[in-house]
Amino acid sequence: MANRQTEEKITALYERLSRDDDLTGDSNSILNQKRYLESYAAQRGYTNIVHYTDDGWSGGNFDRPAWKRLVADIEAGKVAHLLCKDLSRIGRNYLQTGFYTEVMFRQNGVHFVAVANNIDSEEQNSGEFAPFLNIMN
């Protein structure tokens, strides 16, 4: 019998900063997003961290390189958890963002957390305001 090495699923940390976001100052910087998400993941014991970073990309454009790589990894069953700072990091088009958060992530068994919005797909009531927040993005 051949030995099969099981691959541990990853905890994906997604960071995005558009040129317009950069004007808001340091709080949304890529480095700050990474630190924020790494701290959250460590506090919860999430391991096998992989960063997906789109620096300089608009949230209205879902044809972002790191985003496309992340979606491919989700579809390939490689992702257990997906963390982002807030829903606006996923995207600014509420219909597309809603498709990912409400349909695609669930269908692929991905635990999704938008930390600053207190949205956690494993918490029963945490996503009640997600559609409203999504529209506001």
Please give the residue ranges for each predicted region.
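Short, structured surface patches at the beginning of a domain
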Residues: 1-137
